[in-house]
UniProtKB/Swiss-Prot annotation:
This is Fluoride-specific ion channel FluC. The gene is fluC. NCBIfam families: crcB. GO terms for molecular function: fluoride channel activity; metal ion binding. The lineage of its organism: Bacteria, Pseudomonadati, Campylobacterota, Epsilonproteobacteria, Campylobacterales. One of its GO terms (cellular component) is plasma membrane.
Amino acid sequence: MNFIFLWAALGGAIGSSLRYFVGKMMPSKFLMFESFPLGTFSVNVIGCFVIGFMGHLAVKKVFGDDFGIFFVTGVLGGFTTFSSYGLDTLKLLQKSQYIEAVSYALGTNILGLIGVAIGWFLAKNFVGIN
């Protein structure tokens, strides 16, 4: 029997649990905003950093396919989710919180991309796998 689906499911359960935990730990008031989805924002930025780091290691074949399925597809797939990001943005727009919605959308995308780039750079330059 192929256990690849079980690895993905186990990783997804872990990632989803971590996402829920981080979401509950974050305050809803952030900087000057009364309502800001900081939990999802944090999860997406952290997840982008980690997937950048792990992506470089995967390309360099540092770990096997099973671990990649477990961690990248499962854990990170369960941990980060742009569907939650989309829903949170829509909710802000529906409440006419336009500045929060735009700040959230732009911040998630810009910092997420920066996180991927930094993760990739660190894996490439400090783990010593070129």
